[in-house]
């Protein structure tokens, strides 16, 4: 299935996954870029943005929990974020934190806030749309048919 065909399925869970990957890249790049400023609030929020990129990495690629040596508390916290609604809540919290950069100044961290907000909306729509989370094995490659994701027959790969 091509990328165009995947976007034509109107499966918001896959949209959320793609936007999550883009959000992770943006959070990493903008977190580093905004560390070098003289505003204390911006430095703190850019460090949070940088940390958010690694949290997003573990949320979107759960296989890393088995590969990377992390604490059991961190593993348990990430494993709780398995449903579309929980992912939407996690992305909403990260988006609100980045929207707080407006308290100090308008910086490029707002781009991360916008993408995190869009990701939150996609996961909310996916939760409202139907049964459970449908994921890809890796971007551009199908794990199962899109019909399985929409009908509830799909299982989480780590379940």
From Swiss-Prot:
Main location: Golgi
InterPro entries in the cross-refs: TVP18/Ca-channel_flower
Topological relation to the membrane, as annotated: Multi-pass membrane protein
Keywords from the UniProt entry: Glycoprotein, Golgi apparatus, Membrane, Transmembrane, Transmembrane helix
Source organism superkingdom: Eukaryota
UniProt-listed GO biological process terms: vesicle-mediated transport
Pfam families, per database record: Cg6151-P
Residues with glycosylation annotation: 11
GO cellular component assignments: Golgi membrane
Function, in words: Golgi membrane protein involved in vesicular trafficking.
Family: Belongs to the TVP18 family.
Name of this chain's protein: Golgi apparatus membrane protein TVP18
Native organism taxonomy: Eukaryota, Fungi, Dikarya, Ascomycota, Pezizomycotina
Gene name of the record: TVP18
